[in-house]
A protein has these predicted regions:
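Short, surface-exposed, charge-dense and proline/glycine-enriched linear segments
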Residues: 131-134, 152
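Charge-rich, low-complexity amphipathic helices
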Residues: 11, 127-128
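Aromatic-residue detector
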Residues: 1-3, 110, 129
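Bacterial N-terminal signal peptides that target proteins for export
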Residues: 2-17
């Protein structure tokens, strides 16, 4: 056990020395603190029923955006892009949505509005994605993509 602790301590020391050299004399505590800040976000899952409804709305908005096998035809939409957007808007009013579900709905709405070239509602939808992230956890990728899209649209 002592040997294992010694080896672990040696490895930490060597890593610390390498980090000090590579980061220009940054303290080990600063490097470790930075590493602690980048913890994985544990976002809540999307329910299967909501996922199916979102997929149906996405097919209405843009059937070509649905992943499929090579040569497989695009799925047949059961409504117009406007119907898909309305379906998503109705889903955002559900009270039992978690932050991840709500942010994913707004992200898909942003896609729908962008497809229809409705820039003001696209911007509003991306802002709602970020607002959902203030209430609960959303994925870091979704947050960054929303910020990037807002930057490009403004």
């Amino acid at each position: 056990m002592k040997l294992q602790r010694s080896a672990s301590g040696l490895v930490k020391s060597l890593v610390g020395i390498a980090l000090v050299i590579s980061f220009g004399f940054a303290s080990i505590d600063e490097v470790m603190a930075e590493d602690d800040k980048k913890k994985t976000r544990r976002v809540p899952a999307i329910s299967q029923s909501l996922y199916k409804q979102m997929s149906e709305a996405q097919i209405m908005i843009d059937p070509d955006s649905i992943p499929r096998e090579e040569g497989e035809p695009a799925p047949e939409p059961k409504g117009t892009p406007q119907d898909g957007i309305q379906m998503l808007l109705d889903m955002t009013k559900k009270k039992k949505l978690n932050s991840n579900e709500l942010s994913q709905l707004w992200n898909l709405l942003a896609f729908g509005y962008y497809t229809l070239e409705d820039v003001p509602n696209t911007i509003y939808s991306y802002e709602q994605v970020l607002a959902a992230g203030k209430v609960g956890l959303i994925t870091e990728a979704l947050e960054k993509n929303s910020l990037r899209a807002l930057f490009q649209l403004n």
